[in-house]
């Protein structure tokens, strides 16, 4: 079976919250693309099952008053990550946009990806505008 995709998602509704029973909404939340990325990150990571957020997860983040959010998407999803950052910043959520370069969280391993997450400062409006100007 040859495919250009690493993982092929089934054609079913994705409006679910991955690992919902394991999420602690009171501590920083990490949004990532897929389940393997969430497993590699481990710490309160929620997979989007794609590059965009589904309504159920968005409502849970806002409804549970998440205070700090890390967005960890692959480089090919930078415009999606910028859009998510902008959206959650508008709700007053401290948002961190983790730049992975050409790497993938599931390939980086637990220590490296978590160090990168830990080292990422919160976005401010200036940095968000820079991302929008140079990446979209």
Descriptions of predicted regions:
Residues 49-55, 74-76, 100-102:
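Short, acidic/turn-prone active-site loops that include or flank metal/cofactor-
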Residues 40, 79-81:
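Extracytoplasmic/secreted cell-surface and envelope-processing proteins
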Residues 31, 62, 66-72, 81-136:
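Replication-associated primase and helicase/ATPase modules
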Residues 1-68:
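Phosphate-handling DNA/RNA-contact segment within nucleic-acid enzymes
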């Amino acid at each position: 079976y040859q495919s250009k995709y690493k993982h092929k998602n089934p054609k079913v509704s994705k409006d679910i919250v991955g690992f919902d029973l394991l999420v602690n909404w009171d501590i920083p939340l990490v949004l990532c693309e897929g389940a393997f990325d969430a497993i590699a990150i481990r710490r309160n990571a929620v997979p989007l099952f794609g590059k965009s957020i589904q309504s159920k997860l968005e409502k849970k983040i806002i409804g549970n008053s998440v205070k700090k959010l890390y967005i960890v998407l692959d480089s090919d999803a930078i415009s999606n990550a910028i859009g998510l950052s902008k959206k959650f910043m508008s709700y007053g959520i401290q948002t961190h946009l983790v730049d992975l370069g050409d790497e993938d969280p599931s390939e980086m391993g637990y220590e490296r990806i978590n160090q990168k997450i830990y080292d990422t400062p919160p976005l401010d409006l200036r940095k968000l505008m820079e991302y929008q100007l140079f990446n979209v």
